[in-house]
From Swiss-Prot:
Binding site for Mg(2+) 1: D302, D317
Pfam families the UniProt entry points to: Ins134_P3_kin, Ins134_P3_kin_N
Organism: Oryza sativa subsp. japonica (Rice)
Protein name: Inositol-tetrakisphosphate 1-kinase 3
Free-text tissue specificity from the UniProt record: Expressed in roots, leaves, flowers, anthers and embryos.
Similarity section: Belongs to the ITPK1 family.
Amino acid sequence: MVSGGRVGGGEGEAGEAAEVAVAMVDNEEEMAQAQAPPAAAVAARELVVGYALTSKKAKSFLQPKLRGLARKKGILFVAIDQKRPLSDQGPFDIVLHKLTGREWQQLLEEYREEHPEVTVLDPPGAIEHLLNRQSMLQEVSELDLSDCHGRVGVPKQLFVNTDPSSIPAAVMRAGLSLPLVAKPLVAKSHELSLAYDPISLTKLEPPLVLQEFVNHGGVLFKVYIVGDAIRVVRRFSLPNVDVGDLSNNAGVFRFPRVSCASANADDADLDPHVAELPPRPLLEILARELRRRLGLRLFNIDMIREHGTRDRFYVIDMNYFPGYGKMPGYEHVFTDFLLSLVQKEYKRRPSYSSCEG
C-alpha cells in the first residue's frame, strides 16, 4: 500500500496509480517468494536439528561422514540437554529422538503443542505401537497386498503372559507348529530364542511373543524406511529347520538377534531364488501403507521370503529409528530427507555454529 500520498488530477494521478500498481506487483512477488523461496535461499539458511539420543545411539548414528555431509548441506545437529526444558533450548527446525520413558514423552508432547512449527521425528504416541511386539505386526496383518507383485503376511504368533508350565497347552490350543521363535514382549531387546520341543517351552520366561518359525533360506531382508526413501539390505539369518532337526534337537537355543550387521549377505554367493530382493513395487506399497497407518517416517521392516516360493513374504519384526548407520549411503539418504522436511515459510534462526553437539 502507498501511504501519505496526495490524490490529485492529470499526470500526478496517473503517476500515483502506476506507483500503486508497481507496489502491488512488488508485494505479490514478495509474497510468492516468501511462500516458495528459491533453492539458494534455502541452502543459505541453517537447518537446526536438535537430537535426543542415548550416547550409544548418538555414536552409531552421528558418524563423521553424516556430520560432514550435513555441514556441507547447511544442516546443524545440536544435542538436546534432557535436564533443561525443551522450550529453553533451540530454536529447532526438527527434533530427532529415540528415548523412552513417560516423563520424556510428556515433555515432548507439551513441546509439540507449544511449537507446532517444529517437526518432531517421530510423534511419541506413534512410536509406542512399535515398542510392543503383541501389537507391532497388527497393521501388517490387516493389509491386503495379495495383488501387489507378491503376498505379505505375518507368521502365526501367540502372546504369552502366564505360568511357563501352561505354555505347551496354550501353543496347542492356538494351533502353532514347532519350532517357535520366542521374543521379549518389549521390543527394546533384540534377543530371541528358538524352542524345538514342548518341554523347552516351559523353560521360557514370559511375558513374550511366540512366533512360528518360517524357513527362509537363511536370508533376511532389512527394509530401511526414511520418509519416502526405501533401501534394502540382505543379511544372513537363522538356517532352515527340517524334520530331522526337530527330532535331533531339544531345548532352547538363544540368539542375540535374528540377523547380524557383520554378516552382510549382499556380496555372498547365494542361491538366486533365495537372494532375489522383494519386488520394488511391493516394497513401495508396503512402506507407504505402513507410514500412513503408523504415522511414522523412520523405521525398518525385517522381511523374509518363505523358502521354496518366489512371492510369499513375511514381516517378522519392525523397529523405530533403527541402526541407519549400518545402511550403505545412509548419510545421503538422511540429509536429503531432513532437507525435504523444511517448510515453505522460512523464519530466520540465529546462528548455532558454536553449539554443535
